[in-house]
Each structure stands twice: as C-alpha cells, then as structure tokens.
C-alpha cells in the first residue's frame, strides 16, 4: 500500500489544493449536485448522458437516482442504456430487477451483458448464467456486437482512461494485451497509473491518504481528478464535503458528475450520522429511566 501511496503523492506534488468554497451561485450543495446530474442525464449529447448516468452508481439505495437510471434504460442510445444497466447493480436497486430482466432482450449485446452483470450483483445469478450459456452455445445472436463495442471503446481515449479509474492498478488494459492498443491511442503514460493509485487507496483510512487524495482531486489531469473523487466517495467520510465542493463546477463533465454524486453520497452519510448522534442522548435517558 505504501508503494501505491508514493505513486500518488509523487505525481501530486506541486499541485495546489483548491480552496474549499461553496458553489458560485450559493445554492445548497445537494441542490447544485442534483442539478448537475439532471442536466447531464437529459443532455442532448449522448456522451454526456453516459457520463452522468455512470456517476449514479455512487448513490446506493437512493430512490431519485434509481429513477434516473431506470429512465435511462429506455434511452435511444445504446451506450446510455448500457451505462444505466451497469449502474443499477452497484446502486443496490433490487426493485429495478424487472426492468433489468427486460433489458436482457435489448438488441444491443453491450446492454444485455450490462444488465446481466447487475442482476448477478443484485443476487439473481441465474439470469447472468443464462446469457453466458446462450452465448457459449451460439444461441445468443449478435454476440459479436459486444466485441465490436469493446473495440470501439479502445478508440475512445476518455473511455480508456475511465477503465483505469474503475478497475485499479491491476486493471486491463494496463495489465493485459490491450495495453499496446492503448499506447497507440494515448500519449499520456502517467495519468492512468496515478488514477489507478488514487482508486486503490479508497479503502485505506490513513490521514496521509486523505491529504494525498485531496491534492490529487485538484490535479491538472481530469482522469486523476475523477479517480480521486471516486476514491473520496468510497471512503464515505463527510469531512471531504468541503474539500470537493469546487469540483461541482469542474470544466470536465466526468469529474463534475462524479463529484455531484459524491456530494450527495457524503451528504446522506452526514445526515445519517447526525441523526444517530441525536438519538444517543434519548436512548441513554430511556436506559437510565428504566433502571
């Protein structure tokens, strides 16, 4: 873990930490965050819709986010539908199972596999196994389309960078055959490694990691900023709310959407902590009265 920390810290040196300031229009944080995501999922550009829907995965058991993802399952663009199907699993959207099962009949293989994966995550492995079986014996038509869609992603530098953000240090393409393809596409050799390092540190609660992530989130490379925000979300520490507030206005839409989902996630956690703290005196008084 110390090696991963040194990678992140070394490349983050000299990067100034952005000031912890509220959004420019003084909107409440959560209102600003929801507005960003709403604008993203309804954007006329499919790429932005994909990025906004993808960010929803950071909001588990959130009815509003779940409704947004479910609506995206019916998007006219297959990449948006696939992003929605992938997001619903990590969101713990058990009530979305019927909609995910319906998505198994989508004409685009990428959507089908995304839905099958989420069903597996949600505790319905039989659906995923059925899809895999049909592909194996050749009954599932259009399976080649999934391969084609993956090859198309190799031509998309942002998609490749996000693959690094999502899967960590041991991720494909940087640990497998696709690495050579990536090198032909991108001239940036360090950002993916730094992004992976940031994500890998998500579960390490050392205070030094907090400082490194706070610094990395203001990095000049968007992939590093996005990875740092993702790691901050996974740490579930409301103390980071003030730190990542400026990212709600990040010029990169991926960072902006990830930060918006992170603000909502941490705000919900903060509210839960405050409610729990408020209940403690009452519980103690009741216990004392019962003695």
What feature does the model see in each segment?
Residues 42-86:
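N-terminal, post-signal-peptide region of Sec/Tat-exported proteins
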């Amino acid at each position: 873990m110390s090696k991963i920390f040194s990678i992140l810290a070394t490349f983050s040196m000299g990067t100034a930490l952005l000031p912890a300031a509220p959004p420019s229009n003084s909107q409440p944080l959560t209102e600003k965050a929801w507005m960003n995501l709403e604008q993203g999922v309804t954007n006329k550009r499919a790429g932005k819709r994909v990025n906004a829907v993808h960010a929803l995965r950071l909001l588990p058991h959130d009815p509003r986010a779940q409704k947004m993802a479910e609506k995206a399952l019916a998007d006219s663009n297959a990449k948006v539908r696939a992003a929605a199907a992938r997001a619903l699993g990590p969101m713990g959207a058990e009530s979305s199972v019927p909609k995910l099962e319906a998505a198994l009949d989508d004409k685009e293989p990428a959507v089908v596999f995304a839905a099958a994966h989420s069903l597996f995550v949600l505790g319905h492995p039989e659906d995923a196994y059925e899809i895999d079986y049909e592909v194996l014996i050749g009954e599932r038509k259009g399976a080649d389309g999934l391969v084609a869609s993956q090859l198309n992603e190799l031509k998309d530098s942002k998609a490749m960078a996000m693959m690094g953000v999502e899967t960590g240090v041991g991720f494909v393409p940087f640990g497998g055959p696709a690495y050579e393809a990536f090198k032909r596409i991108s001239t940036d050799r360090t950002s993916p490694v730094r992004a992976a390092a940031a994500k890998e540190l998500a579960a390490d609660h050392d205070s030094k990691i907090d400082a490194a992530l706070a610094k990395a989130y203001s990095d000049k490379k968007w992939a590093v900023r996005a990875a740092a925000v993702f790691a901050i979300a996974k740490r579930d520490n409301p103390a980071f709310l003030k730190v990542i507030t400026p990212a709600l206005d990040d010029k990169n839409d991926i960072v902006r959407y990830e930060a918006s989902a992170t603000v909502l996630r941490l705000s919900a956690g903060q509210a839960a902590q405050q409610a729990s703290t408020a209940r403690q005196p009452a519980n103690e008084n009741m216990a004392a009265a019962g003695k």
